[in-house]
Amino acid sequence: MQKIRKGDKVVMLAGKDKGRTGEVVQVMPKEDRAVVRGVNVVKRHQRQTQTQEAGIINKEAPVHLSNVAIIDKDGKPTRVGFKVVDGKKVRVAKRSGEVIDG
């Protein structure tokens, strides 16, 4: 089970976008990376194809999972733990002890 999933609200802990928040768009567990909307935006040169024009586009690049933290209910970053509730493994916020999903 992953600690950070698609749709989670996260905050950046390090890097050029430190302190910025966004929603996880994609998680790549094998690479330990995630794509966060509005964070780590880079410019990419797009070659012209039959369907697309040539030009420079802005695109979100993946960030390492160690540089993001889930935002708790009070708006502060928290670590994630696991707990078994009713025979089901759920994610729990270490800061408040609340179940994140379930």
UniProtKB/Swiss-Prot annotation:
A Gene Ontology term for the protein's cellular component: ribosome
Superkingdom, taxonomy of origin: Bacteria
Annotated SUPFAM superfamilies: Translation proteins SH3-like domain
UniProt KW keywords: Ribonucleoprotein, Ribosomal protein, RNA-binding, rRNA-binding
Any Pfam family the entry gives: ribosomal_L24
NCBIfam families the UniProt entry points to: rplX_bact
Described function: One of two assembly initiator proteins, it binds directly to the 5'-end of the 23S rRNA, where it nucleates assembly of the 50S subunit.
Protein name (database record): Large ribosomal subunit protein uL24
Species name: Rhizobium johnstonii (strain DSM 114642 / LMG 32736 / 3841)
